Amino acid sequence: MSGKKKIVISEDVTGSGIERLKKIYDVRTDPDLWKNILQLKAALKDCEAFIVRNQTKVTAELIADAALLRVIGRAGVGYDNIDVDAASKAGIVVAFSPEENAVSVAEHVFGLFLSLARKIPGADRSVKGGGWERKKYHGTELLGKTLGVLGLGKIGYRVALRAKAFGMRILAHDAFLSSTSLHVTESGATLVSIDTLLAESDFLSVHLPLNEKTRGMLNREAFAKMKPTAFLVNTSRGEVVVGKDLAQALKEGRIAGAGLDVLEKEPPGKEHVLYRFENVILTPHTAGLTYEAQEKVVEAVAEDVDRVLQGLPALRFVNFPIPKK
């Protein structure tokens, strides 16, 4: 294997794209490597490409120790686990997969919407427990309800398109879009202030990157502005929602329920403040985990890692790195 450029994969990233890389490069894969920082540092010493998902914390310290590193490939959308500034200063390209799992996430959102609106998980548990409580599980239709999309990017846009098929009214808040933006005009969304979005939404779907502005955005004050009949769904980043504030809002009946694919801490452990609520549905960060989506995600990141190692520009990149000397 000597003489080949080395690629390290520190999490469970598999697929035809990785198999193609293995034919060209020295690919070292350990799905648990992210758990041991010392072993990870050692593995990156002579590595030119590094592929991760969302568990590996690619810190400035880790980057500083990887002198040969040229590209970090994030198999997925969010890259808040990567110190992009440090990578840029070190001349390292950060590539990602910005829309390859968008359909899967949008479909998961509607799975949560329908499960909440029709109380499907509770009804299922009741019947399996010997019950037949039809009155308890009266639901509500999506037709004619108002969907609020917080972040009308590649995923939020696809959620809005599906909402049209359900006959929903669509509101959106996105600081980067105007009323003439393609995502707005094609989805039929009306851009509104965040306060209007919170106040008028029957279903609120969150699609925000994690940064200092969005961290904790959905807190006690935000929940106080929502309808008591409204449902919250978050498939973006757990830290956008303040979990204890959400629990209090649910306890006080300020909102009707929540579907969360992401939490502030993942995995959350055996005890969590939201476990006791029947009107909360939790999934283990699986919104983008379909066979179809993951094949596309891995194919995209593998393509860009290969391009950078071949001296070509990445097609899907986060940063503009300072050229290495």
Spans of features found by a protein language model:
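An N-terminal-biased, well-structured beta-alpha scaffold segment characteristic
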Residues: 1-95, 199, 219
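Short, Asp-centered acidic motifs that coordinate Mg2+ and/or phosphate
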Residues: 48-49, 71, 203, 231, ...
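Short glycine-/small-residue-rich Rossmann-like dinucleotide-binding loops
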Residues: 55, 77, 202, 208-210, ...
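Residue-level detector of alpha-helix initiation sites
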Residues: 57, 78-81, 96, 100, ...
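Rossmann-like dinucleotide-binding domain for NAD(H)/NADP(H)
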Residues: 94-95, 220, 229-325
